[in-house]
C-alpha cells in the first residue's frame, strides 16, 4: 500500500463522508504551495544562471549565497502601492492579473507526478490542459484593453496574434501524441512510453516519444517558449518598442501576478513536455527504476527550465514578422506533414507503437 493509500484510508475512518472534500483541498493546497516555492527559486536560478553565463555572480547578498533573495523580492512587491490609471476600466483592470494566474494553477490538476499521484486523473486530461492553458491570452488582452494605453493595447494585440499562431502548431504536436498513445489521459500517455524494443532491453529513454516524434517534440517546446512570451519571443513586452506591453500600467502585486503566471506557465510547459515526450516519471534506464518516479519528473522539468533560461541568455529577440513567419510557414507545415508521416508509419509493418 502506497503512502497516499494509507493517508486516504486513515482519513476516511477519521472524517467519514467529509474526507474526500478535505483530502482534495489538502492536495490542492500542497501543490499550490510547492508551485509558489518553485517559482520563487526558479527566478533565483534564472538570475544565477544568466549571471554565470555573463561571467558574474548573480544575486549573492541576501542570505547565504543569495538564497533569501526571492523572499526579499516578494516583500518588496507586497509593500508597493497598486496605482490604477485614472482612465482605466477599474474592475477589468483588477480582474486581468487574477485571470492570468488562475489558469496557470488549474492546469496542474491533471499533470501526474508519478503513477496514481495526480489531483484529477481525468480521461480527457490532455484536452483539458490544452484548453485551460489557452485561457491566459484573454487575460493579456483584457489587461491591454482595460489599461486604456496605446502601448498596453499594442502588446495585447501582439499577444493575441502570437498565441493563436503557435497554439495551432502545439495542437498538431499533441495530435501526434494522441495518435501514438491512443489516449487523452496523461498517465496512460506516460505508460505508453514504457514499452517497446528499447524499453525491453532496459534502455527506456530511447522508447520515449521524443525520438519517433522528434519534429513534434522540438516544435512543441519552442512553441511553448512562444506561448509563455519568453525571450526570444517576447515582442509582447518588447522593452525597446512598447516598454512593458500589457503590463506597463501595473505596479505592486498586480504587476507581480503577471510575472507569477509567466513562471508558472514555464513550469507547466516543461512538465507537459516531460510527460508527453520524455516519459514523465519513467527512469531513463531500467536499473534506475528503484528511484522514486517524482525525482525523474522533477529532474526533467528542471533541465527543460534551464533550456528556457539558456535560450533567454543566448538569442536576440525576434522581430514580430519573423515570429509570425516561423509559426505559420515553418512549424505548422512541419507538424501537418509529420501527422501524415506518422499515420502511414502506424499503418505499415514497421509500426513501433503496437501494444
From Swiss-Prot:
Chief localisation class: membrane
Enzymatic reactions: a quinone + NADH + 5 H(+)(in) = a quinol + NAD(+) + 4 H(+)(out)
NCBIfam families, A to Z: PRK06076.1-2, PRK06076.1-3
Gene this protein is translated from: nuoH
Subunit structure: NDH-1 is composed of 14 different subunits. Subunits NuoA, H, J, K, L, M, N constitute the membrane sector of the complex.
The protein's name in its UniProt record: NADH-quinone oxidoreductase subunit H
Bilayer topology annotation: Multi-pass membrane protein
Broadest EC class assigned to this enzyme: translocase
EC number in record: 7.1.1.-
One Gene Ontology cellular component annotation held by this UniProt entry: plasma membrane
